Amino acid sequence: MNIFKQLTIVWTMSLIFWTTLSHAQIDKQGNQLPVAQELIIRPYVQYHTPGEATLYWKTDVPGPSIIEYGSATSERKRVKDAKPKTDHSVNLTGLDEDTVYLYSVTTESKGKATTSADYSFDTTFNYTVKPIDTSLNPYESIKGYAQAAEKILRETGITEGYCLVYAAGRGQLAFELAKRSELIVLGVDDDMKAIGEGRQILSKAGLYGDRITLMHSKSLDATPFTANYANLIVSDRALNAEQVPGTSNEVLRVLRPNGGVAYISGTAESLKDWVSLNADSFTIAKGKKSYWAKSVKAALPNAGSWSHQYGNTTNNSNSGDTLGGAGKTNEMRVQWLGRPGADFGIDRNPRMPAPLSMNGRLFHQGLNRVCGLDMYNGAMLWMLEVPGLRRVNIPRDAANWCLDEDSVYMAIEGNCWSVDSQTGSLDHLYQLPEKAKRDTHEWGLMMQEDERIFGSTVIKGGSYTTYWGKEAWYDQREGTGTFKVCSDSLFSITKNKTEADWTYKNGLIVNATVTIADNKIYFVETRNDIAKAIKTGRVEVPEIWLDQYLVALDANTGELLWEQAIDTEDGIVVFYLTYANDMLLITSSLRPKYHLYGFSAKDGTQKWHSSHDWVSDNHGSHMIHPAVTGETVFLEPMGYSVATGEKLRDDLGRREGCATVAATSNALIYRGENRRVAMWDIEEAEVTSWMNLRPSCWLSVVPSGGMILAPEGGGGCSCGNWVETSLGFLPDFSD
């Protein structure tokens, strides 16, 4: 076959199919064009155990599952499951640590083979815990420990995260629990001799220090552990004692909020006495051989959540968290630090989606990867490597994900993935409801409220994904990088259903303005014909600011409630919509000013307009997203009345660097002086900061669950000696 024919086949297949063939495959297949098999989901990777990776993908018609993979220094291996299916999974074993693997997917249909382009995964990000050989038993006698461990895991349902064995003795219960679960187990006891013997036994078996650690404490009444961290607390010595060691006060202090479980064995009388100071927090039940006291810790008081890009569906950048009254960094303490690090992400500049947090969990996006963590101790719950996940320049778009109590919803190419927030498993797939758009459009904004998810359609290539080069700093005041991503339809789907409840189509919807409150969905759209004719998904013509309407729909039915023609200053730099206290606030940034507008959420009538100069025209000072606390909307450096637009204050503490603002009831969190992560106490107007800690260039530090969460987002910065690790902070008086 001549080279011209080979190139023709390559070019044709690249256009028609979801695949690009290698030279070897072209030589093998000759003139035969394969029958296309569409990938509904491109292959993605999840790690379940060290040294292994499972690849998943979905096709439109059944076929075998075939993977070819290898590292840069190894020959490719081929794995095939011949059973035809549409939901594919292949488990790869024997993988090296800290290694990038390339892989491709081959499908066969009617005797023809189609091979995808190369994808990659990096085992550096296999954060799974090392399993313990179940045949091991370094202890001389079992004494019912195995049965106790099995009962504890079965009755509590806690099998991962951190376990504290309170009064751990020689560590036998700690060993049995670790062997049967993915728990990282810490044992503590005031008996130094028992701790020493346990360390020797576990060290001799090669088990000490990885999954199991034993510590000595002078008193079990005051152990050397931070509060609110342990997913599971049990007791070794209580299994075989007439009196339960220590105090229930200390156990409850250390127990993780929002679902942490204490499960302590003893006699009926000993447990009744032990829980007496906290009787309302425990239940006591009879088992086969003993009684068990159980406590499930509630959420911290007045703890909020961060379920959407700017906190919630109102886009008010406020989690509703009180942080126990804390308004300064010196009123917070480090709760945990660790993974992921800077290598997990892209860089601080491209302005990626914010981390999200809800129901005791934290979620963070990196370079085509996403992970779930326990927000109170940093334990890694799961990690996915997902081609097509990446979205950047969020100030000019909507984020690609949101949360509810149990699921993470991610807009990935033309689909919405519903992922179990505890396990990372893909539970449900939503496709664009208009089948005719699935070849030309992608899923745009991603929001959820109650029983519905909300999405939009954006022309393919509309969302920003470029993260390399000067233009990818996205700090521009005009031109490339400031063009707004817009959707040509908006829709709602009931969770776990497939068909849309309703679809709205009229003008071009500015993604960054879509807001939901009180069962209504609000947005700004342009109905200008020139703007609507743009077929890139990013509207780069000035006509986007003409023929604009503020629109309100019934979120349940899609019924038009009202629409109002508006004429604001052009939002060349950024353009946002926020709901607060029956008002809709439009933020528009145009050199050299911010413009803030107040509209009635009842009918869209304009109530007020205020403006002020930018603090500067670079490093994010010209593109801040507003934050609302109480009756005040803050937009650097001002605070305005939500109701009237009256300037209430102009003393917002100095902000430096490219990051926007997150709010609690008592403080604003942003990048303060010397470019550190800072808190501005709203009442005292005082700024405090953490040394050597910086955020990303948009939003990577959020308050949630009674904490401040800072998954690493500042990697790549050269303007300081920064700590490039993830951290969680808890109020220092939360004990």
Regions found by a protein language model. Name each.
Residues 25-131:
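Short, surface-exposed linear motifs at loops/turns and structural transition points
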Residues 123-148, 298-310, 440:
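Low-complexity, Pro/Ser/Thr- and charge-rich linker/hinge segments at domain boundaries
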Residues 158-175, 182-186:
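Conserved class I S-adenosyl-L-methionine
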Residues 206-220:
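Conserved SAM-binding strand-loop segment of SAM-dependent methyltransferases
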Residues 220-232:
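A short acidic, Gly/Pro-enriched loop at the edge of an enzyme's catalytic core
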Residues 243-260:
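A short glycine-rich, Lys/Arg-flanked "PGG" loop and its adjoining helix->strand segment in the class I
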Residues 347-370, 392-417, 438-490, 506-550, ...:
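Repeat-blade elements of multi-bladed beta-propeller folds
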Residues 375-377, 420-424, 494-497, 554-557, ...:
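Short loop/turn segments that connect beta-strands within beta-propeller blades
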